[in-house]
């Protein structure tokens, strides 16, 4: 009986997030280098932030035989409740049959709550003279302390809302004092 009484308070302290973290909007494309990419988003519908997210892609041929297993990461370090995190799994496969499947799994840890204090206050998308897509903008630190190692992630969608590609940059300088702004270019 003492074991059961100990277990009940322990279970109340553990906040489950199973089933509330989902992979959505995933698809594949072949990059300019001929390499297969699997892109998509992870959505956090739990009440807790999650971090240390690892995506596991299992590539299979048309008969279900496993060809390869590849680990990938979400481009952000943490996904806050109600938010999404983009991923781009770059495979080792240059020659893939037209008939292949993949399964996605993931692992994560629950993280301590934190405030979302970095805000994109302006952004613009245009093409340069070589027809490359350029996204530029300004971020602001609305927190009380200096923020370090700030990443800006861009997720591009097709007209049907499917993820086309993702990109990430780290701002320079790599810190932003409270109340200050910084520019980014992706």
Predicted feature residues:
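Intrinsically disordered, low-complexity Pro/Gly/Ser/Thr-rich segments with frequent PxxP/GP/PP motifs
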Residues: 67-95, 164-186
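Short, solvent-exposed loop/turn segments enriched in Ser/Thr/Gly
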Residues: 33-39, 129-136
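Short acidic/proline- and small/hydrophobic-mixed sequence motifs that coincide with surface turns
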Residues: 48-52, 67, 99, 146-149, ...
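Asparagine-centered strand-capping/turn motif at beta-strand->loop junctions
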Residues: 42-47, 139-143
